[in-house]
Amino acid sequence: MPRMPASHILIVVAVAVSGCATRHFEARNIDDSSFVDRVVVQEQEGIQISATVPTAAEVVSMTGLDLYADGIQPVWLKIENNRSQYVRIALYSIDDEYYSPMEVAWGYRKGYRKESKAAMERWFHESGLPRFIPPGETRSGFVYTHHVEGTKGFNVDAYTTTASFNFTFFVPLPGFRPDYMDVRFAELYKPDEIQSVDLPGLRHLLAETDCCSRDKSSVATGDPFNVVFVATPVALRRALLRSQWQETQSGSLEGKLARQHYFHGRIPDGTFLKSRPDGSEQKELRIWLSPIRVGDAPVWLAQA
C-alpha cells in the first residue's frame, strides 16, 4: 500500500482540527430577556439598585451556554447613582469567590472559531458589571457567582469617598417553591395556645418542652432539639440565607429524612441544607415554629 506524503498528512490534520472549531457564538440583547422584568429594587440615600437572577434556561437562551451546569449563576444588577460622588461596588460582597467575566469566557472557548471566541470574550467583558458608577449615571451588568438552589440571597456593598452602604437581596427564582411556603404559619396555633414570656421565662418553658421530635405516630422518639431561634420570620430567613443555608424545595428528595420527624403533629416547617467545607456531605437544619413568643418575636425549635 503506497504511503501518503507527510505534507498531505499535515494538510489533512489541519483540516480536521479546523473543522472541529465550527461553533458560532451570538448572544441575545439583555434587554430582550424576560428576567429583567423580575427585578427586586432597593434604594438608600440616592443609590438605587435593581437585582434579578436569570434561570438556567434563560441563560442558555441568552448566551447558548449552560453556565448553571458548571455551577455558575449570573446575578444581574442595575445601579443608579443619584449622588454627587462616584459610587464603587464591591463585587466580592456579592460572592467572595465570584468568577470574572473573562474567566467565564475562557472556560467556554473550546470548539469555537477564532472570531467566535473573540465575540464571546467581548460580550462577557462588556456585559459585566462595572465597579465604578459616575455621579448622575446608571450602569448595569452581570456578576458571576456560585450557584445555589432556591432563593438567591446576597449582599451588595457600595462605597463613596465619605460613606458606605449595605444592601441585602433575596431574589426568588421561578419554578422553585421552598417547603416553608406550604405552611400557614398564622393558623398553626390558636390564640389561647400562644405563650408570651421574657428570656428567663423562655428558659423555664424550654425546660418543660419535649426534648425531641417524634415519629408520625407520636410514639418513637427522634432527634433532640438542640438549637433555638428567637426572631421574626423575615429576620430568621435573612440570617440563614446570609449564612449560606440553602432552602429545600417542597416535596423534594433532599427533605425526605427531615419529613420523618414531627413536632406538634407536623413535619418541619422548613428544612435547610449546607455543604460541609470539604464537600463530603450536607448538614441539615430542621425548624419548627413553637407556640412561644418573646415580646413580638416567635421562638423556633430546631435540629442541626
Segments (PLM) and residue ranges:
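C-terminal motif of bacterial Sec signal peptides marking the signal peptidase cleavage site
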Residues: 17-19
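Surface-exposed edge beta-strand/loop patches
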Residues: 21-28, 126-193
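Low-complexity, acidic Ser/Thr/Pro/Gly-rich terminal tails and inter-domain linkers that flank the onset
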Residues: 28-69, 186, 206
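Short, solvent-exposed beta-strand/turn "edge" segments of beta-rich domains on protein surfaces
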Residues: 59-76, 82-86, 132-134, 217-218
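A cross-kingdom signal targeting lumenal/periplasmic-facing segments of multi-pass membrane
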Residues: 73, 80, 251-304
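The feature marks short-to-medium sequence segments in extracytoplasmic or secretory-pathway proteins
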Residues: 82-134
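Short, hydrophobic/aromatic beta-strand segments
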Residues: 85-93, 154-156, 237-242
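Terminal, regulation- and interaction-focused segments at domain boundaries
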Residues: 209-239
